[in-house]
Amino acid sequence: METLTFSCHSLGKIMTPTRGKSNIDKYNDAVELLASTNTKYNETKNNETKNKETKAAINLLEKITELKAQVKELELIKDDVILSETAKSYIEEIWLRNNYGYKDTVITHELIKGIVCEKESIELLVENDSEYREKNTEFFKNDYIHGSPDVILEEVIEDVKNSWTLKTFFKADISSDYYWQGQGYMDLTGKKKYKLTYVLSDTPPEIVTKEINWQMAKLSYAVTDGCFDKDKIAEQIRKNHTFSHLPIEKRIKVFEFEYNESDINKLYKTIDAARIYYNSISL
């Protein structure tokens, strides 16, 4: 049976935090509370005018006994991974695809633009800083993850993201998905630095036309009744997708972060848990 591995672009899904505290957080909290309770007990013994059998001291001793038992129990499971519901849902999707060929088809204008404009975006980066780049075609994999970064430079992995509009470019940041994707690519390639680059490329006319038609379809009755000006809406949509008049430096946004071995260890432990869950699924 083939071992389940995950693509780097999906790592953010399985690393989605669970609601509430993790086992390690619960363990650390219990250890901290035990230490502070021990301190209070010692202070109580020293400050009491009577002996250590006072009511306050007895209560604290009982609390310490309970906490020691709790710490002992939590220590056994502190490294166990609790998968989030998002992670479980994604693992179930993989199971359905692998076992029955089922796969949701989600194709958006944003996705199409990202694919179509990838080469143009890389060329824009070269024009901006004169550093030679070319689209990476090498596929990397290990026992846990696999993927193919956009660009591999001498010391840096660079992933290029095409922003849909000026608004999405303005709000662009290091999302959890892109963080884990970057960590995965660095681990696969041995690079220690990751550059997440957002680029504003003009949306291809055919995609803009489809976007206009889609928006018009949503407003069909309102447009027919004269509530909206069809030409003005189309003009605004075209404007929202045209950026070539802007200076190049205004069309590029870069975020950088470094390889984190501790996070990679967490990732692989989570994948171990994901495999166990995967093998427990049935129709």
Q: Which stretches of residues belong to each language-model region?
A:
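Charged, glycine-rich intrinsically disordered N-terminal tails and low-complexity linkers that flank
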Residues: 1-116, 120, 124, 205, ...
